[in-house]
Amino acid sequence: MDNQKGALFPDEVILQILARLPVKSLFRFKSVCKSWYRLPSDKYFTSLFNQLSVKEQLLVAEVSDSSSLICVDNLRGVSELSLDFVRDRVRIRVSSNGLLCCSSIPEKGVYYVCNPSTREYRKLPKSRERPVTRFYPDGEATLVGLACDLSKNKFNVVLAGYHRSFGQRPDGSFICLVFDSESNKWRKFVSVLEECSFTHMSKNQVVFVNGMLHWLMSGLCYILALDVEHDVWRKISLPDEIRIGNGGGNRVYLLESDGFLSVIQLSDVWMKIWKMSEYETETWSVVDSISLRCIKGLVPGIFPICQTGEYVFLATHKQVLVYQRRSKLWKEMFSVKGSSSLPLWFSAHAFRSTIVPCN
């Protein structure tokens, strides 16, 4: 920081204040002085900023009649985010620690990783997979994952699915392509996995914790996890109450909760939040049970999108709701005006506002 006589606050206090600003405001203040201009690229400051920002979860969603995304913040309300800087028509596939992985709409097989807060992006090189080998059944990867490691300022993109050679039946091989941001290269490994199936929401809600990417299997068999450093797949058990009862007719969703793996179980009248308190032993515990009686009419079409220990964001066809866990109050944060072709929950993702380079 620039030393100035008569400064009101010590440098560290100023850094703590600046680290709590939205990224947009922080970049606006770069013109104040040289030291503030350098902050977004300063390792100490970006680490401090990211440590604070990961404690908050935002919700981003595409609105069908708008070219921008809505961004819903528990404290600051609703704002807009644009992906126009990517210079392609894209759709969000997954989110991780402030980065979004998007696929090109006009050109199949083209992927981008971008940070909408800093408006930086990287177009990923195409893998060297031969065109005679393709993902089954529709030519696209079954799973898309993004693992953003804030401690190392790096990310991995994962494309995985069953492959078949052209003109042949699938042979059961589960192919995984992993992009490494440091080497700017793809690597490939092949596993033998029993046939896995996933819902639209379980593909959207990919959770990166403990160096692993996690997807919830449809049928509530287990959670499929990938160690992105060692290229190893692992199966993680769900809570016995969910697994043995096959969900008991309830809907179950996989989320993160303050760095822990979490599942949310929805019945007609209750929302039960589970947290994996011990990862290695796969120990689950119930941390909250929330009555849904006051939003009973919305329950059949409501989906939890993201959460912290303080609140839960949920989306319906046309609304975004927040539940405050301490006060036990519900609040509508956003509502689509007029008709909407796609439901909000279909394109809603957890998001964080971080300073992570992606180019």
Curated annotation (Swiss-Prot):
<dbReference type="Pfam" id="PF24750">
    <property type="entry name" value="b-prop_At3g26010-like"/>
</dbReference>
<protein>
    <recommendedName>
        <fullName>F-box protein At5g49610</fullName>
    </recommendedName>
</protein>
<dbReference type="InterPro" id="IPR036047">
    <property type="entry name" value="F-box-like_dom_sf"/>
</dbReference>
<keyword id="KW-0833">Ubl conjugation pathway</keyword>
<comment type="pathway">
    <text>Protein modification; protein ubiquitination.</text>
</comment>
<comment type="subunit">
    <text>Part of a SCF (SKP1-cullin-F-box) protein ligase complex. Interacts with SKP1A, SKP1B, ASK11, ASK12, ASK13 and ASK14.</text>
</comment>
<dbReference type="Pfam" id="PF00646">
    <property type="entry name" value="F-box"/>
</dbReference>
<dbReference type="InterPro" id="IPR001810">
    <property type="entry name" value="F-box_dom"/>
</dbReference>
<feature type="domain" description="F-box">
    <location>
        <begin position="3"/>
        <end position="52"/>
    </location>
</feature>
<dbReference type="GO" id="GO:0016567">
    <property type="term" value="P:protein ubiquitination"/>
</dbReference>
<dbReference type="InterPro" id="IPR050796">
    <property type="entry name" value="SCF_F-box_component"/>
</dbReference>
<dbReference type="InterPro" id="IPR056592">
    <property type="entry name" value="At3g26010-like_b-prop"/>
</dbReference>
<dbReference type="InterPro" id="IPR017451">
    <property type="entry name" value="F-box-assoc_interact_dom"/>
</dbReference>
